[in-house]
Amino acid sequence: MNFTKQPASLKYLSSMKLITSQDQDFFNFGEVSREFILEQAYVNGYDFHMLHQDMNCIGFVLSIFDEDARDEYEYKDLNCEYHENLFDAVVDSEFDKIWPHLVLKYITYYPCSLNWRGMPTIPIVYVSKHFWYELYRTGFLNKLYHCGSWTDILLLLSGDVETNPGPVETYKDLCRRKNIRKRKSRIREEIKMQQHIDKIIGQENEEYKIINVNMQGIFSFNEEKEIIKSTAWKFNSTLDKTNSIIDNLIPQLEETLAGFRKTYSKCESKIFGTISVVDVCVDLISALLQVSFAKPAMKIASLAVEVFRLIKKYVSNININIDKIKELLSYGKVALNNNNPIIHVTMQSNSPILEVLLQPNIIVSAIFIALSVVFHKKFTYKKLGIEAMIKRLGDLGRAAKGCSDLNVVLNQAITNHMLEHFGKNVLGLKQEDELKVLVEGYRNWCDEVRDLVGHKINSDGELDSKSIVENIMKDVYEIQRIENMYKKGLEISRNIAELKLPTKLTISFNTHMRYLTEVFKSVDTSGAFGNKPRTQPIVIWLFGESGRGKSGMTWPLAIDLNNSLLDNVDEMRNFSKNIYMRNVEQEFWDNYQGQNIVCXDDFGQMRDSSSNPNPEFMELIRTANIAPYPLHMAHLEDKRKTKFTSKVIIMTSNVFEQDVNSLTFPDAFRRRVDLCAEVKNKDEFTKMCWSKSAGKMVQRLDKGKVKKITGDIHSTVPYIVDLIDPESGEVYKTGLEYEEFLDMCLEKTSQCRDDSAKLNDFLMDYAEKRANRSREIDEVCARTMDEAFVDAYDDVIDVNMQIETVDEMELIEPNKLREMIEQCSNKIVYTYEGIAVKITSLAFKLATLNYEEQWEQIKEMKYYVKVSSGVNYLKRVLSQGMKVCEEWMKEMINYVKEHPWMTVSLILGTLIGILTVVGFWKWLCSGDKKKNPIKRHFINTGNVLILPDRELNTFWKNQESLDLRDMYINRVEEHIISLLKLQHKVVLVPKVTKYILTTVENHAKISDKIILITRNRYLNYQGKFVELICGEINQFFIDPETLDTNVEAFASADLKTFVQRKPIVIEGPEFVEAQTSGDQITLRKQTQKVIEAFASSDAITMARKTPKFVESDDVVEVSMQMWKDQVAQKLITNRVLTNLYKICLVKENGDMVPLLNGLFVRSNIMLAPGHLVGFLSDSDTIEIRNLFDVVFRVPWKDVKKVDVVNAFGESKEAVLLCFPKFVCQHTDLVKHFQDSESMSKFKRCEVTLPVLRYSDKMNRFLATLIECDKVEAYDRPYTLNDSSKGQYILRQGLEYTMPTTNGDCGAPLVINETQVIRKIAGIHVAGDARGKAYAESISQKDLIRAFSKIDVSMQIQLDLDQTLNFNQQQXIIPPNAEFGPEDLDFCDLPSLKMIPVGRLSEPLFEPGKTDIRPSLVYGKISEIKTKPAILRNVIVDGKIVNIKHKNLKKCAMDTPYVSKEMTEEAFQLVKSVWLKGMRNELKKVLTYEEAICGNDSSEFISAINRSSSPGFPWIRDRIKGTKGKQGWFGAEGEYILDEDVFEAVKTRIQNAKNGVRTPVMWVDTLKDERRPIEKVDQLKTRVFSNGPMDFSITFRMYYLGFIAHLMENRITNEVSIGTNVYSQDWNKTVRKLKTMGPKVIAGDFSTFDGSLNVCIMEKFADLANEFYDDGSENALIRHVLLMDVYNSTHICGDSVYMMTHSQPSGNPATTPLNCFINSMGLRMVFELCSKKYSALNGTKCYVMKDFSKHVSIVSYGDDNVINFSDEVSEWFNMETITEAFEKLGFTYTDELKGKNGEVPKWRTIEDVQYLKRKFRYDSKRKVWEAPLCMDTILEMPNWCRGSLDIQEGTKVNCENAIMELSMHEEYVFDKWSKVISKAYQKATGDCLDISTYNGYAQERFLNYYL
């Protein structure tokens, strides 16, 4: 059995792509495509079945596997034993001869097990799709299918050892050789096949214009060159094969072309007559060449000459109006643009660019080459090599096909479209087929009308409709039939109007329509005529969660209900004609024609308010009523006659609760609903999906399961319905199937129709009965004689005379008579004399005759039927009308056939098409431009600002306003002078007239500036007709109802700015410039698509068109020496420069090579040029560094790469780099990227490119702002080509001129235009030596599209814009000049390696005076060794020293990256220790009340401290006279739960669910404490940070249970939190530290805050989530909360900055988090020490898992004590631990700093200190004591806090000092207790309340040991 292992052919790969597809995907192809595939891949249908179905044989099943479900660990642990891993060997042996042998063994050794039926299971052998196809190709599947014994065929294929003793590889050898099985999957195979196919096809693509570029990154390509050299020999065989193919291909091509010419010449004369197409093509090409080669000034004249020459030659008999041609020759000044040279540039970006230039000369040359080959059998090429030959053949093939396609398209365009338009609109013609269909439908309709009314039309043509109406009104379905008939008549009427038929053709229709309308008016209950109450429609409301398939259920339900209203199957199939989809955003009911069903999808999505009501609610009330409802139509002729007549209204929405604010009685909306149903899905048809809005997994309809289970692409089976009362919300029926729900809908629909019909009957009867009700009052009056005489006529009876018409006799045709006789009906026919004869009697007489005799007699019979004269009248009308119509059709068709237009159109087709391409017709037909009004956002007169009125803009409500909009304009002009007051700042009028403007402007001169708002947007101003268009003013407001500025785009100039500030330099009387440019003056115009939350949602606003370019009418020109757009500068300095990093490659020797720039756009996700990915390998390490010296070094393999693609899935020259959380989070920039609306706003603009460049002079990176005043956007693809780096496609981007250089790629392109709100247009990707540069356009949607591929926990958002003041004036950064962080003044950064954010509007108050003071015994006990720390800035050597900045610098350190593998291994080991002893009572999220007040679940879940600071911003609202949080939670006693804090907590939690950080500002505060005198003199004051109380409460809710668990299991879990040093906890600690022997060390970390490693810290949230195990939603919340700890934002003075790694001391998890770092770090250090020692000495290497066998630790924060065994003490001791910690970035030192500078490798327990206490064993009481250091004890009495009474404070400290002395030896207690007592007695004259040595010991025993 020979298998093919060489690379597969392209044909095989192409067919394999389809063979390996799903069955349903295969059948989605067209019929022709499927036949071609089957022909290429299969022999017959039997083989197709074989390739797509499992092969069942005796004893086993052969099947195809899609994807291996095993994980990587199962692949690594491979066991080479038959029984355990034979299956893997079978799979690995594909395409090997041993495969059948292994299959046989696998079946033999397969363990026999029984299924649930007790039958033995059959082994399944899986093969890959490619090997399955190979088995099919070799005939194995066919043999297997027909074999009787599978053992025989397998032995035959594998080769019997006796008959074929050749060497066979053993199973174990194969298994060892292939020890890890390759994973295969459908996706991988399809991708590889598609890549191969794309590569082959790509070689045949048209050659684009190539721009040679140099990538602006610095890369090395030596390795790539070597690879190319080593693989070049592989192309030899390919070239040989190609030569042989070409030898066969060229003769075949020539033969094909010869056949084409022969065939074409035969049909040419028949198609084109005497005209030669070859001559036409040659003339056209000659004409174009003449024009192309003409001088620029003569191009138009040359074109005119060639056009006249062609017209004279081919169409000389046609008269042509040449006025435009004369105008062309006289005034044309613009020639065809033929000046499009190829540009040779040097790309300055790291990607090549491709540009397609459609130049006329290139087009003409291509056509000439193609035609020369096709018609003249010439093949022009130069000997450019075999590769060029192949490419040329591909070009010629496509060119030939392109000529054919062009001919087809042009002819179709002329004959099918242009002729049709000309005939219809000019000649009044119509296509024959369409006319036939129209006439046939018209005839059928006339027959129906005649059957209805024909027998009731009298001889005068009057219709007696009363009896007809009486019969119809008895049947509801008959009423519906009449209504459908009437609708059909309206449709025919519209067709007649569209066809513009002559009057003679419409007489018959109008006659029938008149009678039908008369009947329909009488029976109408739909309300179409508005003459009576209409049929009340049934209102069905479907609601349910998103993804339930409500819209999918709407269509079947609408069709079922529509079918109930129809009786014609054809009408039912054309269901879309009777279903109308209503969109309330469209103001008009366009195309509404009385459809039976109206659907309102996504009902109630628009927000409803009294000021901006949602029209859906009022519309529903109107449509669901019985009163006639005229609809708002766009066309005037439709307004008067279009009324709502639908029978069913179906609404769908996501929620049941609708917030209705615009109705005075909101229940009126719900009362209109007849059936309200919640749509759900059956479980078997659903799947679980992640909902970002809900922040959790939700159940949604799985369309794949629906198709799989039901077999249909759509079904109603998955739906179940719960019925809900729409008013009360009560559920009254549940679990209804669709059919049950449909029955209720049908019943309700029928009931509504019956009730409406009965109501009309009642009203008519009621009107008749009450006719004389008004005259009853006359009965009380006396009657006169004359009245009595008149009453004598009361006996006269009023009757309706029934006019009897004479019926006419109509002869029955023989065929009709035979049909009547065969049916043997009871009908009566008449002889000529009028004698009645029954059909049954005729049938009886003819029954005995044979068929031929019967037919002969029937043909001789003459019988008649009586027909009403009205019926005959209508028949004659119809006959005459049809006759006229047929004659008219014949005339029209003959006219078209005989008209020479067909011949002319073939000639003109090609000419018109080419002239269209070059834009000739657009120029020729252009006339004078329509005079449109000048569009402006505003008009500024200097004192008055005129704005258009918008309901969304209600800012004026906050000003003193005068609203005159509801007054008539003449009344406004009459009273405005008297109504205007000095306090009025805003005036609202219906229209601005010259008088009103003059009056308001005069008033403004004496008061202040006034905003004039007009409802009418058109006005005349200074002789110009102006239209005011709405600008996006609310883009600058957080809430449209307020004037609070929205700093999203850093705008500082709002309406307040206009009112309060005075104008500066003005160059024109119309314009005023505010002090910054981001005001409402230069806002972009409202666009059609409303995306932003503050954009208008009304239909009128949405309908406005967006201009393609920024219009300059609203630009304010001023004389200021500053940036054109201050907003752009602030965006760059405040945001872009903090997020912009230089990406560098780290060499093996540690040197760095700068590559390019990267911009963090969200969290730790960076946007970079796409070509970066191709030049880095997984073994590389990169370093990123920003302007502020923030540095991160990360392995490239740990960075996730996500391509940025456009809406069509095409990759852009950009990539998102998702860094590990080790890289700090950055502020969100996504909102500053352009959106689709802003992209369409500009074609040319001014831009700035901020770049980072290395300065050799300064030896660091500096920033430079490069400017360009002209940037052009393009939307065609460019290929960026770099000779050394390859090609990259730039699909959409920008081109500009800038002095860019290598390394500038990746810098963001910022638009420096005030009109553009979204400033970032893209990233720079290339440049050339001439200064041309190119940028890839990146929009918000591009980024969001890429974010969908990244886990939500990796894209946590942080937006600090709304919390800071960006309106402060900043120093101007000059362009093209280097600058560093010291040149930026928007933030006073404490140190480099921190990230600046901005400034607060005003700094926070901080006390600068200490609260510590000397006590009464100060200096009388011992020498003073401490003093209060410095709390304010000081002057040293004439310079001011900022104490905070000085002490915060220790946090500004770089930390190393810890590998994921090491971190994960340490985490798993720590988890097993920390999570011991869990209690379910603690594994829950605390409530808001429990987080504040505590609960009884644990003693460690205590109440919050009400005396500590509430944090920012709460500190600003602190109630005077209260301390800390007491103003919100009460001062003492029971806690008060404040509502404002509760709302803040809820908001924080909700944001965290959505992956958004609510800003937490940690306030840096100098700690008021005593420190050693030498440290105070060195200005070392510790800084602590407190956070907002709503964050602390939220953090306690989600973490406090876990922290309580740690405290309950203290010491045994390595954590000392909660340890009581006076209790048995100290004994327990000693036992823990002596577990591994006597050797211990105690150390602490220097600058611990600066060395914190985020790689370790972020795992703390994972550990807490493991403890709670309460779902992904809460897990995400904990990650978001913890990120505010290790990537914290701080306030220092008035400046706000971010730390790259942090641990604010005020967070509730400070100590547990530090303990976690200790436990994780020591395990990593253990492995590092072991590896180093093993490598040096060749000894056994211990792994991290051995840590718990040899080491025992306890830690409290950054303080720890380590006990280790003798076995590891040689390489795991104080010395080696210190060295290993340095690799992790920590500085670990001996706790006692060593004596004489020497640090021992280990100590004993008695020699170390922990928590500033020693370990002393009391031999008398057999316990371990924890004596405090003597220096600390003796220093305590010297100081006290200012809040206490000085004497009381001294006494308390002295007593505490003596109590601490009792834990030392007794002699120490006796000595110093006396000294302290005497000093206090001498100072105060009082005695201390103290106990004896034994007394204190007894007290500790009673309190803590019992």
Curated annotation (Swiss-Prot):
It comes from the Viruses. It holds the Pfam family Peptidase_C3G. Residues 1126-1343 form the Peptidase C3 domain. The keyword Nucleus does not apply. Residues 513-692 form the SF3 helicase domain. Specific enzymatic cleavages in vivo by the viral protease yield a variety of precursors and mature proteins. CDD domains: Dicistroviridae_RdRp (cd23194). One of its GO terms (molecular function) is RNA binding. The active site is at residues 1171, 1213, 1305. Replicase polyprotein contains helicase, VPg, protease and RNA-directed RNA polymerase functions. This is Replicase polyprotein. It comes from Acute bee paralysis virus (strain Rothamsted).
